[in-house]
Regions:
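Loop-helix junctions at membrane interfaces
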Residues: 1-152
Length: 152
């Protein structure tokens, strides 16, 4: 009976560590997106920021569900603080950009994670193009969203 309890305690401690790391990454994502190096770009509320780097780190370090939560919560909170109209789209897009990454190995820089950066860019650019197209029209979105994504 005590062995089972010890195993449960280890599993609980592991879960607490992961949840804590997720919360820290979400907070860092919010800060890096909304306040640190926050440069408005374009006419539709977009801005250049370093928040995505925190999401990429979370995706490389944390298991996928935790990384998705960190990205969605951090990015969503940043948009609620700066450009609330974008929050629903951001929550979905930031979860999706975590999908190509891997946290299975001990190395942070792997071929898969380097390729994942480019896939994440494509997911983000496409997601914001669609969101902006729904809000402002697809013709205008092509010029404003795509150019903003390239700058980001």
């Amino acid at each position: 009976m005590s062995e089972l309890t010890a195993k449960e305690n280890i599993k609980t401690a592991d879960t607490v560590k992961r949840i804590t790391a997720t919360a820290v990454m979400a907070a860092l994502t919010t800060l890096m997106t909304a306040y640190i190096f926050h440069i408005p770009v374009g006419v539709n509320g977009g801005y250049v920021h370093l928040g995505d780097t925190m999401i990429y780190l979370a995706a490389a370090f944390l298991p996928l569900p935790y990384a998705c939560a960190a990205g969605a919560i951090g990015g969503g909170l940043a948009d609620l603080l700066t450009a609330p109209v974008w929050a629903p789209a951001t929550i979905i897009i930031k979860m999706l950009i975590c999908l190509p990454f891997s946290s299975k190995g001990t190395k942070l820089v792997t071929k898969r994670n380097v390729v994942a950066l480019f896939l994440a860019f494509a997911i983000s650019a496409t997601g914001y193009y669609i969101a902006e197209g729904i809000m402002f029209g697809f013709t205008a979105s092509f010029f404003t969203s795509v150019s903003g994504s390239i700058v980001q």
